[in-house]
């Protein structure tokens, strides 16, 4: 790893716990995803949650749209270890039901959860059972009066929606909560989070909502979340992709890894290749990524096709492979090298 270590001054925030996972304060930034199975299909949902846990998910969110889904949630919760967030919209009574079943966090949407008395009922239940809440504001479901006031989603509209419900929780003397202000537009989301970060001390859950497919969504999320994380904003994140949720976890860790905020597994440094390459760099990288994806120990591995940059990259990596004179050279340190035939690489 390079000796140059950038300094990111993290925003100060209070610490809460989602299950056994600390969020905020000095805790590592948590990476989470959301199931896309039918929650009433208990077997499929449990299998997906366990798959997400295997690739490093700290927290998994599960949509609970009906009372039948709430009953299924009870069975799901009994079969998994990773903390679960119940995603609640429209019917506050579902939140009360899953609270009985050991949910680790409740996500409520201010745009559709209803009157303050319903929020009070959820808060009272959460307090009694020591369950944190996420106030999840979304540009696509702002309250009608805010839509009329601002005309369209704006950073100020997202902030006002969030603060409106933060005020309710403050008034109810409930401080075990985190907040998100998501939008599909990168600049809208980033500016809303910047405003929110200045306004409150609670942990922030980051996300660019409805970001798109695997490629475009990963890029939008990397840009938006990367901007915020580099400014020290953010305590937990989800990369929202129209793809396998496992990819959300992988991309989330890749974003944190790129900013040297939190590392998990191998960080591959590979050249884009040109006619100077002495071995199949692309094939080697693809094979190693698949073969070594279960490794969780942080490690930098450089795979460079020729001697132009290969030796230099290898010296700041834990292990380097570089092409040279029709051979591949494996470099462990400046003084430990081994040449192998290209066919053996």
From Swiss-Prot:
Molecular function via GO: 4 iron, 4 sulfur cluster binding; 4-hydroxy-3-methylbut-2-en-1-yl diphosphate synthase activity (ferredoxin); 4-hydroxy-3-methylbut-2-enyl-diphosphate synthase activity (flavodoxin); iron ion binding
Question: Cofactor stoichiometry and binding?
Answer: Binds 1 [4Fe-4S] cluster.
| Lineage top rank: taxon | Bacteria
| Reaction it catalyzes | (2E)-4-hydroxy-3-methylbut-2-enyl diphosphate + oxidized [flavodoxin] + H2O + 2 H(+) = 2-C-methyl-D-erythritol 2,4-cyclic diphosphate + reduced [flavodoxin]
| The protein's annotated pathway | Isoprenoid biosynthesis; isopentenyl diphosphate biosynthesis via DXP pathway; isopentenyl diphosphate from 1-deoxy-D-xylulose 5-phosphate: step 5/6
- Please tell me which top-level EC class this enzyme sits in: oxidoreductase
Q: Name one Pfam family in it.
A: GcpE
Q: Which family does it belong to?
A: Belongs to the IspG family.
- What's the protein here called? 4-hydroxy-3-methylbut-2-en-1-yl diphosphate synthase (flavodoxin)
UniProt source species: Haemophilus influenzae (strain PittEE)
Q: What is the taxonomic lineage of the source species?
A: Bacteria, Pseudomonadati, Pseudomonadota, Gammaproteobacteria, Pasteurellales
Q: Write the gene name.
A: ispG
């Amino acid at each position: 790893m390079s000796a140059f270590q950038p300094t990111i001054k993290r925003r100060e925030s209070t610490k809460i716990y989602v299950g056994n996972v600390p969020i905020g304060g000095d805790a590592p930034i948590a990476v989470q995803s959301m199931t896309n199975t039918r929650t009433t299909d208990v077997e499929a949902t449990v299998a997906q949650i366990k798959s997400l846990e295997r690739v490093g998910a700290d927290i998994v969110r599960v949509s609970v749209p009906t009372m039948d889904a709430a009953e299924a949630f009870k069975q799901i919760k009994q079969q998994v270890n990773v903390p679960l967030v119940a995603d609640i919209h429209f019917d506050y009574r579902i939140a009360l039901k899953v609270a009985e079943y050991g949910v680790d966090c409740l996500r409520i949407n201010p745009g559709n959860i209803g009157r303050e008395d319903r929020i009070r009922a959820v808060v009272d239940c959460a307090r009694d059972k020591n369950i944190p809440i996420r106030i999840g504001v979304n540009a696509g479901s702002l309250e009608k009066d805010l839509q009329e006031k601002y005309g369209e989603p704006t950073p100020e509209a997202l902030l006002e929606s969030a603060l409106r419900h933060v005020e309710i929780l403050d008034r109810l003397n409930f401080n075990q909560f985190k907040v998100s202000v998501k939008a599909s537009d990168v600049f809208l989301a980033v500016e809303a989070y910047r405003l929110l970060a200045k306004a409150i001390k609670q942990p922030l859950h980051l996300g660019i909502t409805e970001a798109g497919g695997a490629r475009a969504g990963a890029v939008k999320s990397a840009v938006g979340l990367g901007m915020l994380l580099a400014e020290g904003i953010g305590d937990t994140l989800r990369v929202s992709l129209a793809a396998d949720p496992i990819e959300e976890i992988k991309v989330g860790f890749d974003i944190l890894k790129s900013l040297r905020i939190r590392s998990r597994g191998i960080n591959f440094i590979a050249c884009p290749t040109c006619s100077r390459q002495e071995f199949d760099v692309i094939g080697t990288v693809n094979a190693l990524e698949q073969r070594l994806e279960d490794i969780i120990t942080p490690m930098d591995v450089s795979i460079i096709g020729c001697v132009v940059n290969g030796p230099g990259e290898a010296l700041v990596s834990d292990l380097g492979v570089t092409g040279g004179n029709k051979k591949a050279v494996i470099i462990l340190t400046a003084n430990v090298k081994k040449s192998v035939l290209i066919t053996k690489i």
